[in-house]
Amino acid sequence: MRVAPPYVRAAGRFEAQLSVLTGAGNMGNYNMHAVAKVIHGGKAYEVPVLTGNALKHWHSVYLAEVYQDLGGTQLNEFCKKGVGLRGKNMSGEDASSEAEAIKDLCNDLHGFLLPDKQIKRDSLVRVSFAVPVLEEKNLEAASKFAVVHNRVDPFKRTQQVKSKEEQEGTEMMVFKQEYSSAVYGFAAAMDLGLSGVPLYQEGESGVDDRERALRIKSALVALLRLFNGVGSKQARALPIARLRELVIAISDSPIPNLVHGAYPDYVARSAELLTAYLKAVGKKGVVLCYGVDCPQSNNVLECKKADTLDDLFQEALRRALPGGQPARR
């Protein structure tokens, strides 16, 4: 795959209380939360998780909203509505080529597959599962639990009522929903310089430099929306959430992914990994930290701590965008 900067990597932690980060189906009137097993200290823990599929979906939703807010217009109806039906052109029909498909924002950044036409595009945005931080106390405290909810149908007669002429009653419909509470780690990788560039087919997409810069900015800013607004059942269980820590690495070189935020030493290990790689290839990069101490800079890796999220994202946008800020239609 061709090299096209910027390459952005992110990792961090967020706290979510009383949330349904990913639903996992139901048994009758019992709605379940997705769980998975992680290993720590030689022990297996079954923990609530936010799947990478769900995290990627929410990034695409917020990407489209941010992009339109910044004045972007090149997205089809599926992308506008947050429907993950990829591979459609701007008219909503199956695209005839990769170049045609990536005129649409969501196809471009989140990829697609049209098996009947043998057309595909790898996602430029890749995300991990979000799992509870791998510390014994947090893993033991991470929990999912069921809450009983009631719905009342005022028009449905009770079973004892035999005829319409008799007194009408109401019927209570009980269901249970699983929720979770924990501190979660996450990781993401975005090869944003390949926006608007066909990966597997010849041809021009018509995505100019200004449009490409707008898409890069939208993808980065969408991260701000992500960790306070993910999960299913949001109509009645908007997550009680906050971002605790965020680390963003940016380079003109295709750098390794950061160590997942679930690991206790993810910041130091990420800096160690990036330093080793950048020295080996003779390139440079920057790491921006929020909510956590940044390692010391060295001759290939600049490390900067941001006191606020605004400081972090202004610096990230300055580093990632061609010619710096701003990008707006």
UniProtKB/Swiss-Prot annotation:
The answer on whether this UniProt entry bears the keyword Translocase reads no
Q: Where are the transmembrane segments?
A: none
Q: Which domain of life is it from?
A: Archaea
Enumerate the InterPro entries for this protein: Cas7/Cst2/DevR_sub_I-a/Apern, CRISPR-assoc_Cas7/Cst2/DevR, CRISPR-Cas7/Cst2/DevR
**GO terms under biological process:** defense response to virus
Reported induction = Repressed by 5 J/m2 ultraviolet light and 50 mM NaCl, slightly induced by 20 J/m2 ultraviolet light, 100 and 150 mM Nacl. Member of the csa5-cas7-cas5a-cas3-cas3'-cas8a2 operon.
- One Pfam family matching this protein: DevR
Keywords, in A-Z order: Antiviral defense
Which family does the entry's similarity section mention? Answer: Belongs to the CRISPR-associated protein Cas7/Cst2/DevR family. Subtype I-a/Apern subfamily.
* Subunit architecture: Can form a Cascade complex with Csa5, Cas5a, Cas3, Cas3' and Cas8a2.
Q: What does this protein do?
A: CRISPR (clustered regularly interspaced short palindromic repeat) is an adaptive immune system that provides protection against mobile genetic elements (viruses, transposable elements and conjugative plasmids). CRISPR clusters contain spacers, sequences complementary to antecedent mobile elements, and target invading nucleic acids. CRISPR clusters are transcribed and processed into CRISPR RNA (crRNA).
What protein is this chain from?
CRISPR-associated protein Cas7/Cst2/DevR
Its taxonomic placement starts with: Archaea, Thermoproteota, Thermoprotei, Thermoproteales, Thermoproteaceae
Quote the gene name from the UniProt entry: cas7
